[in-house]
Amino acid sequence: MRHYEIVLLIHPDQSEQVPAMLERYKGMITAGGGKVHRVEDWGRRQLVYLIQKLAKAHYLCINIEASQAVMEEIEHAFKFNDAVLRHLTVVKKKAETGPSLMMRNVEREEARKAQQQEYAA
């Protein structure tokens, strides 16, 4: 089995369905004998360019270990899910379990905003 990193851009109006989508995809992976090593919800972020006339999207990052057959099934599910605007799958050499650079930036931004709110109060 190989290690993969999947980044999903979800339609911003479907943000409430993100946990259910994650559970469905996790179920597909574990049913095929794979493992989920890391799931990060980067939240709603600004897009660099418009995708389907949208300026924002909900970002997810999933690191998994799965077979090629499971990956084909998952990518097939991404293609037929209208809520998934874009997806990118990258083969990794080893399992990634620590926080990604993007997640560290998100946490840093949240800490900075919380600190600014404390100063404002």
Swiss-Prot record:
Protein's name in the database: Small ribosomal subunit protein bS6
Gene responsible for this protein: rpsF
Family matches, as Gene3D superfamilies: 3.30.70.60
Keyword RNA-binding belongs to the record: yes
Any single Gene Ontology cellular-component annotation: cytosolic small ribosomal subunit
InterPro entries attached to this UniProt entry: Ribosomal_bS6, Ribosomal_bS6_sf, Ribosomal_S6_plastid/chlpt, Transl_elong_EF1B/ribsomal_bS6
Lineage: superkingdom: Bacteria
CDD domains assigned to the protein according to its UniProt record, in alphabetical order: bS6
NCBIfam families: S6
Biased composition (Basic and acidic residues): 105-115
Gene Ontology MF terms: small ribosomal subunit rRNA binding; structural constituent of ribosome
Its job: Binds together with bS18 to 16S ribosomal RNA.
Family of this protein: Belongs to the bacterial ribosomal protein bS6 family.
Keywords annotated in UniProt: Ribonucleoprotein, Ribosomal protein, RNA-binding, rRNA-binding
Disordered as annotated region, ranges: 102-121
Species classification: Bacteria, Pseudomonadati, Pseudomonadota, Betaproteobacteria, Burkholderiales
Pfam families (alphabetical): Ribosomal_S6 (PF01250)
Gene Ontology biological process terms, A to Z: translation
